[in-house]
From Swiss-Prot:
Family: Belongs to the UPF0335 family.
NCBIfam families: PRK13694.1
One Pfam match: GapR_DNA-bd
InterPro entries: GapR-like, GapR-like_DNA-bd
Domain of life per record: Bacteria
Protein's UniProt name: UPF0335 protein RPB_1426
Molecular functions per Gene Ontology: DNA binding
Amino acid sequence: MATSAAAVQDEPATKFAKDQLKAIIERIERLEEEKKTISDDIRDVYAEAKGNGYDVKALRTIVRMRKQDANERAEQETILETYMQALGML
C-alpha cells in the first residue's frame, strides 16, 4: 500500500517534469528552425552580393574580422605578415 501511495504523490512532480521537458524540447526545436531560416537568409545575402559582383570570400573574411576585438585583429595581422615575410610572399 505504501508503494501506491508514493506513486500517487510522485504523479504531480512527474507531470511537471514531463511538461517542463516537453517545453524545453519545443523551444529548442523552434530556435533550430529560426537558426535555419536565418542561415538561409544569410546565404541569400551572400548570393545577392555575388550577383552584384562582390567577392563572397572577401566579404566572409571581413565579417569574421569585424567580430574580432581590434587588438586581436592587429595581432592576427602581424602574425600573418610575419609568416608571409618568412615565406618570401611580401
